[in-house]
Amino acid sequence: MAEALCSGSVASPCGEVGVGFAAGLVRGAAAAAALAESVPIGGYSSKSTFPSGRVALTERKARPLPRNLEAAHGQMNLTIGKAMRWWEKCLQPNMREIESAQDLADSLLNAGDKLVVVDFFSPGCGGCRALHPKIAQLAEKNPEVLFLQVNYEKHKSMCYSLHVHVLPFFRFYRGAQGRVSSFSCTNATIKKFKDALAKHGPDRCGLGPAKGLEESELMALAINRDLNFTYTPNQDLVPIADALLKEAAAPGGPWLPLPATATQLFIQGSENSLLSSGR
């Protein structure tokens, strides 16, 4: 029997030679290989490329998203980010945000005789957010006026130096006059803003270069260590009495007479009048 099995044939009861077990095993292996080619295994597709029934597994690659879906996803993220920055909506060509104290000072000086409105706001200020669309409309109707936005959260130290403690807050500057108006208003008091715009906005001939920030404001910004702002006071604006006191107090400097007080001048004037009258 063992020899018959090894020879691959066995006699049937009817005298016919049956199919050998070895042949059956070969057919079974071939069927298993064919089945393996058509059945995926754990995210892999099986493909037989080797002889003797060996199976090679190739990894399935994920299909890339269509370009239109990727673009839509990016636009959605961009829209969400922009929706949170309400102060950037409805901006007009004559509206821009201030980046630093130096930027504010230079912008006012370079505006010439143009009316400049400085808008102090905060992203978390509900009144500022409600008023912003109306300010943008007024900017659109008055293209000759320059609107400068100052973000209070980004420039707290600068706002402290400029004595801005309430929001929304506005300051109007015009040419050689410098600051011509300063106030706070909301939607309920928007008429105050419109009146100031009508009063200081009409075209007129300037009598000198733009003044910009006040001298005291420039000094306050210069001594603020949190700001990268430098300013040299104009020597022409230093009072004569202060200059005399500094020179007289300087060690080794020439002695200069101090200016007379108001009382001394009054007494001297009285004596002169008495002498002239002959008393």
Curated annotation (Swiss-Prot):
Entry keyword set: Disulfide bond, Electron transport, Redox-active center, Transport
Family: Belongs to the thioredoxin family.
Top-level taxon in the UniProt lineage: Eukaryota
Gene Ontology CC: chloroplast
Any GO BP: cell redox homeostasis
Coiled-coil annotated residue ranges, if any: none
Name of the protein described by the UniProt record: Thioredoxin-like 1-1, chloroplastic
PROSITE patterns (UniProt xref): THIOREDOXIN_2
UniProt-listed Pfam families: Thioredoxin
Active site per database record: 125 (nucleophile), 128 (nucleophile)
